[in-house]
Amino acid sequence: MATKENLQEAFAGESQANRKYLAFADKAEADGFPQIARLFRAAAAAETVHAHAHLRVMGEVKSVAENLQAAIDGEGLEFKSMYPDFVAQAEKEGNKGAVMSFKNALAVEQIHYGLYSDALKVLNSGKDMPEAKIFVCSVCGNTVLNGAPDKCPICHSPKEKFFEV
């Protein structure tokens, strides 16, 4: 395997390990093991360092405009083709949990696509986005500017499920 493919595989593995370890940390914390949770969070942070290093070596961290366009392209692919295909397969198999997870992600990726597109338009005018508080739904990932809604329009969770980034 060529070095480029090794870097891509390493980036994917480190990224997945980061997310998995953060989920493990949440579980350890919830079960009353704060030091084990801290260990998982530390390892997750280390995996992020590795993933970012691999991404930089691959030349994938570019200008802000190029990074926004890459995010737009990725989110577009996810909500236009990837998640619809995943939803269809999960429905065919009768996996209701996967259907809900995929539908939530599809809806949120479309929102991210719009947010990134708006940010790129503003950036292309030579400015940063206007200052805003950004909130994320802890259930579905819905991302909103300037305050959490009373009820998430995607998963219908209450306002209390949103956290500020």
Where are the regions a protein language model picked out?
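Non-heme di-metal
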Residues: M1-V165
